[in-house]
């Protein structure tokens, strides 16, 4: 029995309960976008207007696109990806004037408007800045699916000044950006929605990307790009802790674009930080407010780049054929890396100093570029936040990937016989993309996530475990770590009756044991008792807070912390410089209940400097803390070492994480603790002991009747539990040594 099949549970998708596992929390990692602590920001519709106003200035202080309200409807029992109408600020009516003309309305920005508009586009509508200098927008009623209408609509009618620093001559053509204010008032130059690939539509759906075609004239890259087609989280309604991760630009297959933000004055040969968003390979977009690049670029004098890549079946469907080769989303990222290599010097960046950084599935993506021979030479360093290629949710086998693709084909009425793969692909290409993403979960069995990376023989030649064991990966510096409560967010989504989204939630001992039973229905008694034994606080086994927190640790250790540790350990064993952190700060304005602690993704807004935005209510200490995090991250990108040239109380020394010392730095508001691990014993349990136990007890009967591990003297005479204890002690000693 494989370990990934141990912990099973139920997942709530909208109103539908789907069987799911704890070790199969895998599914949740991929349904839900990564999450972080920010304050939700929603704009209300103004007189039904379809234009969303958004100021890239200190006054508005939001990200690359407005955080507009989105809604979805349930289709076939899953969350719909159809966005709702757009939103605008309450003052937009005084800034805009419009005149309707059949299909096109010309909307002109008033000369006295102190705003940069990055429009939200409602379903069936699109808005584009035609000329940044004139401040003119074009509102196009574009039919059922919001999409870019091609490059010509974004070309300027006037010749560009060759001396204009906002006009950059890329290898595909000239582009024009715009200068905006960072939250601190510093200026940055921004280019949004630079095409790096041809739209992957029609016959290009599911295939590896093709480089963008050249264009003539000047392309106005001043509008945030489309988000790739995906489902939208509606489980908690308009709760900002969840909706902050929903896409805030139109959903479209035409989504392969890059964003670049550079400090002003423009640097020469600056370090480049390329962000890869998370979302479980199922969702996500580079334009979220929490990823606002302006503070990081302006405060640390680095070039910040982000990219859109295909997710869900459109990005990771695999049939092993030229038409559906798999890993299209990873090849999107690879093509974007090549674009950065060939063009970033034109923006003031140094192509030899590119650092990839990402969180959750973004961190897994970064790690796969470290492993892939196709990507290793395209960047220098890597930062991995709460993600590792050895996570149980990171990859599936070729056989399983093919089975899931055929299940999807069957669900949408396409040929699904293994002998008719070409027919299946041809049919799937003709389906509406929203139909595909809305039917992916209906094709699955228990505890499975539909479309993730696969060992395809092209991007990946072997499993990450084999690459790490053999030393076949990029030898370089890495910075990596995890947060103290990695599991709570996912547990809240599938144990909704037990862990309600409110203050004061506790878990009794009986509820804890019941939760473990629900999460582990298919394992034998020894394995289940081992998990209960390991995650019980035996000094206070009936403590309701400890029992609640133990559930978080079970999920977080298995899916995140222990895999991050494993990756760091293997890198350190090869003599690479490794820096590890444990993130411990919970923001004052966190919308989630306090008992959720420091959840998966809570570090992201501090990495991007969101607390520096004066409109968001962060404390002065949190602003200073964000400056410290940005400095650590950017120092690493510049030099391979997060430490400043001279140590100080403000920047405590961050020790290397060596194979023997295993040191990490605790990143908290007022702490500078250096620890060892983290969570060495628990990771020995998952990585060393439990696999041995499962192998040793595989012939034992199924799940034993639920009970406390030590509730009677009979415990000491059970052979399976004697094996359990001996194996646990042996594995723990070996792991720590």
Curated annotation (Swiss-Prot):
E.C. number(s) listed in UniProt: 3.1.1.7
Catalysed reaction, written as an equation: acetylcholine + H2O = choline + acetate + H(+)
GO biological process: acetylcholine catabolic process; choline metabolic process
GO cellular component, one term: extracellular space
Record keywords, A-Z: Disulfide bond, Glycoprotein, Hydrolase, Neurotransmitter degradation, Serine esterase, Signal, Synapse
Active site: 360, 486, 600
Carbohydrate-modified residues: 220, 670
Presence of keyword Phosphoprotein: no
GO molecular function terms attached to this record: acetylcholinesterase activity
InterPro entries in alphabetical order: AB_hydrolase_fold, AChE-related_enzymes, CarbesteraseB, Carboxylesterase_B_AS, Carboxylesterase_B_CS, Cholinesterase
One Pfam short name: COesterase
Purpose: Rapidly hydrolyzes choline released into the synapse.
Family: Belongs to the type-B carboxylesterase/lipase family.
UniProt protein name: Acetylcholinesterase
Organism: Anopheles gambiae (African malaria mosquito)
């Amino acid at each position: 029995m494989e370990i990934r099949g141990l912990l099973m549970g139920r997942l709530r998708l909208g109103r539908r309960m789907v069987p799911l596992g704890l070790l199969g929390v895998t599914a949740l990692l991929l349904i839900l976008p990564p999450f972080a602590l920010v304050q939700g920001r929603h704009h209300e519709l103004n007189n039904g207007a379809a234009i969303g106003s958004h100021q890239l200035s200190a006054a508005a202080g939001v990200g690359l696109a407005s955080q507009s309200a989105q809604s979805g409807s349930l289709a076939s029992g899953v969350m719909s990806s159809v966005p709702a109408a757009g939103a605008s600020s309450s003052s937009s009516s005084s800034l805009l004037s419009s005149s309707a003309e059949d299909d096109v309305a010309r909307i002109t920005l008033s000369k006295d408007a102190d705003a940069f508009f990055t429009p939200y586009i409602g379903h069936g509508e699109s808005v584009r800045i035609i000329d940044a200098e004139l401040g003119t927008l074009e509102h196009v009623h574009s039919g059922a699916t919001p999409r870019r209408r091609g490059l010509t609509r974004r070309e300027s009618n006037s010749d560009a000044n060759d001396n204009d620093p906002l006009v950059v001559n890329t290898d595909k053509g000239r582009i024009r950006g715009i200068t905006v204010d960072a939250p601190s008032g510093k200026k940055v130059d921004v280019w949004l929605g630079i095409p790096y690939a041809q739209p992957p539509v029609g016959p290009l759906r599911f295939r590896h990307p093709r480089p963008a075609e050249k264009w003539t004239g000047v392309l106005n890259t001043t509008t945030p790009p489309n988000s790739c087609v995906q489902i939208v989280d509606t489980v908690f309604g308009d709760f900002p802790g969840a909706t902050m991760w929903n896409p805030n630009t139109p959903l479209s297959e035409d989504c392969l674009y890059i964003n670049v933000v550079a400090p002003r004055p423009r640097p020469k040969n600056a370090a480049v930080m390329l962000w890869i968003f998370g979302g479980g390979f199922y969702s996500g977009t580079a334009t979220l407010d929490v990823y606002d690049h302006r503070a990081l670029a302006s405060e640390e004098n680095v070039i910040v780049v982000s990219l859109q890549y295909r997710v869900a079946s459109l990005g990771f469907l695999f049939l092993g054929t030229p038409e559906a080769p798999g890993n299209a989303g990873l090849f999107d990222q690879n093509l974007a890396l090549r674009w950065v290599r060939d063009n970033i010097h034109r923006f003031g960046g140094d192509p030899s100093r590119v650092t990839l950084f990402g969180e959750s599935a973004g961190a897994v993506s970064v790690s796969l570029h470290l492993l892939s021979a196709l990507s290793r030479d395209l960047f220098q360093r890597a930062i991995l936040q709460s993600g590792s290629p050895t996570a149980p949710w990171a990859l599936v086998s070729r056989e399983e990937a093919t089975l899931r693709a055929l299940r999807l084909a069957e669900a949408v009425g396409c040929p699904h016989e293994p002998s008719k793969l070409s027919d299946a692909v041809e049919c799937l290409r003709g389906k509406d993309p929203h139909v595909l993403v809305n039917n992916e979960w209906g094709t699955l069995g228990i505890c499975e996530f539909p479309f993730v990376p696969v060992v395809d023989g092209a991007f990946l030649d072997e499993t990450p475990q084999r690459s790490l064991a053999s030393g076949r990966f990029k030898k370089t510096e890495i910075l990596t770590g995890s947060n103290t409560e990695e599991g709570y967010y996912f547990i809240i989504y599938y144990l909704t009756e037990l862990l309600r989204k409110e203050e004061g939630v506790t878990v009794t001992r009986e509820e804890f044991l019941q939760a473990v039973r629900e999460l582990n229905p298919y394992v034998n008694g020894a394995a289940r008792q081992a998990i209960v034994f390991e995650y019980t606080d035996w000094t206070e086994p009936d403590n309701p807070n400890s029992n609640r927190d133990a559930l978080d640790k079970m999920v977080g250790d298995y899916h995140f912390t222990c895999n991050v540790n494993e990756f760091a350990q293997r890198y350190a064993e090869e003599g690479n410089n490794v820096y590890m952190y444990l993130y411990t700060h919970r923001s004052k304005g966190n919308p989630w209940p306090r008992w959720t602690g420091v959840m998966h993704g809570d570090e992201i807004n501090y990495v991007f400097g969101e607390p520096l935005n004066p409109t968001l209510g962060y404390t002065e200490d949190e602003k200073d803390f964000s400056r410290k995090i940005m400095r650590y991250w950017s120092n690493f990108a510049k030099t391979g070492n997060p430490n400043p040239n001279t140590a100080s109380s403000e920047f405590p020394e961050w020790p290397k994480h060596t194979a023997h010392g295993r040191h990490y730095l605790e990143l908290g508001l007022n702490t500078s603790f250096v620890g060892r691990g983290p969570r060495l014993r628990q990771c020995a349990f998952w990585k060393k002991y439990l696999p041995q136990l499962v192998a040793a007890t595989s012939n034992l009967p199924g799940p034993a009747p639920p009970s406390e591990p030590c509730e009677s003297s009979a415990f000491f005479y059970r052979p399976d539990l004697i094996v359990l204890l001996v194996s646990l002690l042996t594995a723990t000693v070996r792991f720590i040594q």
